A protein has these predicted regions:
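Intrinsically disordered, low-complexity
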Residues: 1-10, 99-107
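Catalytic cysteine-centered active-site loop
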Residues: 6-59
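Aromatic- and glycine-rich peptidoglycan recognition patches
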Residues: 52-55, 76-107
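Hydrophobic beta-strand signal
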Residues: 62-64
Length: 107
């Protein structure tokens, strides 16, 4: 819910709110609201997370993209995620199929 509430906020590289986000800053702060500490790096979030198969994705799981991993979003269900995409765009809901999928973790 926290991440969804940031929809429309601008992307800012290295930012972790409150008015701008990068992808790992958004996931880091969203999960901190649930008492989970994550590093501010998509690659490190993947490296330290509990890996799960794509077939077992549940809302709230973190989904990762590219090789090497350079993007992360929060899975919403129905093949969609909320994420901070890149400069010039804003936090948005997108299909996870729009980028090369690399894996998932459950914090």
């Amino acid at each position: 819910e926290f991440a969804l509430a940031q929809s429309g906020d601008r992307y800012v590289w290295g930012a972790s709110g409150p008015d701008g986000w990068d992808c790992s800053g958004l996931t880091m702060v969203a999960w901190s609201k649930a008492g989970v500490s994550l590093p501010h790096s998509s690659r490190m979030q993947y490296a330290t997370g509990n890996k799960i198969p794509r077939s077992e994705l549940q809302p709230g799981d973190l989904v990762y993209f590219y090789s090497p991993i350079s993007h992360v979003g929060i899975y919403l269900g129905d093949g969609r995620m909320v994420h901070a995409p890149n400069p010039g765009r804003r936090v948005e809901i997108s299909p996870i199929s729009q980028m090369p999928y690399a894996g998932a973790t459950r914090p």
